[in-house]
Amino acid sequence: TLQALDEEYAPIFAGHSDKIYLNEKLYQRIKTIDASKLQGEDKRLLEYYKQNFEIAGANLSSADKEKLKVVNKELATLSTQYSNKLLEARKKGALIIDDVKELDGLSPDEIANAAADAKTAGYSGKYLLALQNTTQQPLLQNLKNRNTREKLFKASWNRAEKGDENDTRATLEKEARLRLQKAQLLGKKSFADWKLQDQMAKTPEAVEAIFSKL
């Protein structure tokens, strides 16, 4: 499947990226370019690549680079596993409704689509409310049956926390630990600090300040 291929190749692509950005000879070639002789786009391009190399870890010792390569491959694998688990959890978390009365408030087209989806999934005569890739489900605003709304909300909210093969909690915990390890290897106190350094906000504190004004 595409998901299996994604999991197989994600760490390979991560390793390929590291071979570029953690390449000492390539980084030194960039550093030897005299920025004072450049102008405009040429100067900005040099700054851009130099910054990208340094953010990726080009200044690390050889030993720390090797540690970072291992972490990056593990993160690539975990990130792909998380996405695949979430995709399967969304598919399997669909809500099956027996009685059309429970769909009061939905349009005729929405009800017809739910019936067709149920038939395709092997539930002829019933109705399937597929989960969307958001926490809040669009159908909630129109459904009038409180019990149906509650079931749909819980199906969405708990889709990846059922203790089955698609439960994402352990994957997220591992990813969080590795992100912290990566940030610390790169001289930052948190992954957010590392991730934001070349963004407009620059720091987690600045992001929080922006959110507080919304």
Where do the model's predicted regions map?
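Substrate-binding cleft of carbohydrate-active enzyme catalytic domains
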Residues: 171, 213-214
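Conserved glycine-bearing catalytic or ligand-binding loops at nucleotide- and phosphate-handling centers
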Residues: 73, 206-213
